[in-house]
Amino acid sequence: MRTLWIVAVWLMGVEGNLYQFGKMIKNKTGKPAMFSYSAYGCYCGWGGQGKPQDPSDRCCFMHDCCYTRVNNCSPKMTLYSYRFENGDIICGDNDPCRKAVCECDREAAICLGENVNTYDEKYRFYSSSYCTEEESEKC
């Protein structure tokens, strides 16, 4: 179900943070975010519960945790300014909410890039039925 929702969002052309985050992921991993990470493991994609399946999935878990610490805005839809410079992602917004969301996305994209060698096709389009709430970790 979450896979269908993610695909629907991308097909509708929703602008905002999801698009920007996808560009960061592509920059750091070389992989298209929508097809590689939109439903990867238990945490990459919309929602998340259970135990992270590998280091790449743990990056998404940490990203979800980061979003829970962002107050007074909608992280998944907040637009922010950033740029790529000499291989780095630079968040350039002075608004505290936008800056925090950008930093969450930046850290996750870097983490995914650092763990791209752990990416395992068996976790792509992973069934959420394997991700049980009883095994969920706390942020």
Swiss-Prot record:
Its cofactor is Ca(2+). SMART domains: PA2c. CDD domains: PLA2c. Pfam families: Phospholip_A2_1. The keyword Magnesium does not apply. Expressed by the venom gland. SUPFAM superfamilies: Phospholipase A2, PLA2. This is Acidic phospholipase A2 5.
